[in-house]
């Protein structure tokens, strides 16, 4: 059987690969770099801008993806908005986890973490052939050199925030009494949110809620990303309790549940997850409590 060229190659910490960067900037062109709120805040601070101003200038979809609309480079692909041909990344010290990891990826299932690269052939060989002439590194040494620990802590902490937001959507549906009454309006809306284009999902979230999710209004503690995420979630939780705790009317509960689900899915996309797959899992849970499509 011929291996699937699009499948992932999973790696061991001791796997040795041509991971010494050529500094050619190839990987700063034509990519999709999703960022979480901690990363957005770090990038804004490194740029000397407020978070909202930086997100408007350098990001898409409310601040969860970096813009790649700079001058064309390798294969005519556009550069990241933060890339400068004469000096490389303008915020290198604050670069997001996905940039630090590249060409590797990180996959987390519950508490198991695996590292991988896309395809059978090592990705850097096409755009940076000179990498063969540079020292090989083990995966473990590469990760240490890229200082991925803070970014991984932020990613994992925001995965927990995503789950808590989805739990809030489920609580509004289930504890609010809708699921037990066989509600058939909420789940189709959830399904639609999961299938929506990123722009459509942004439009489904009220602007004040979108800002609360993606533009946290406090300074970044780069040494403690987990605390940053915890403070951010506490703000979101307080807002949800203030607005939704006293709801009793069915339509209001439906709207609140869909709001929390939209927030969970939007954050999930920022973390590299598939909203469609995420919402399918949460719909299964809701159906066990009586909700219907």
Predicted features, each with a name:
Residues 1-26, 33-41, 45-79, 83-88, ...:
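Short loop/turn segments that flank or connect secondary-structure elements
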């Amino acid at each position: 059987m011929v291996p699937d060229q699009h499948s992932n190659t999973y790696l061991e910490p001791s796997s040795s690969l041509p991971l010494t960067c050529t500094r050619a900037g190839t990987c700063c062109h034509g990519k999709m770099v999703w960022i979480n709120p901690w990363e957005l805040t770090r990038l804004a601070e490194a740029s000397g801008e407020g978070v909202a101003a930086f997100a408007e200038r350098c990001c898409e979809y409310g601040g969860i993806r970096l813009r790649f609309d700079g001058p064309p480079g390798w294969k005519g692909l556009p550069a990241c908005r933060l890339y400068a041909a004469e000096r490389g990344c303008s915020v290198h010290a604050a670069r997001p986890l996905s940039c630090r990891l590249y060409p590797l990826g990180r996959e987390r299932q519950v508490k198991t973490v695996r590292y991988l690269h896309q395809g059978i052939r090592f990705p850097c060989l096409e755009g940076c052939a000179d990498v063969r002439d540079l020292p090989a590194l083990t995966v473990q040494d590469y990760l240490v050199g890229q200082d991925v620990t803070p970014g991984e802590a932020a990613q994992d902490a925001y995965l927990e925030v995503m789950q808590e937001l989805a739990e809030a959507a489920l609580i509004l549906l289930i504890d609010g009494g809708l699921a037990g009454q066989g509600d058939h309006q909420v789940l189709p809306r959830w399904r639609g949110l999961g299938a929506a284009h990123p722009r459509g999902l942004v439009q489904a979230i009220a602007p004040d809620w979108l800002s609360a999710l993606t533009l946290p209004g406090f300074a970044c503690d780069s040494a403690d990303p987990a605390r940053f995420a915890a403070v951010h979630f506490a703000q979101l939780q307080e807002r949800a309790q203030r607005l939704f705790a006293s709801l009793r009317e069915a339509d209001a509960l439906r709207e609140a549940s869909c709001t929390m689900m939209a927030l969970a899915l939007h954050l999930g996309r920022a973390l590299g997850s598939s909203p469609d797959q995420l919402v399918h899992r949460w719909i299964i849970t809701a159906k066990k409590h009586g909700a219907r499509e």
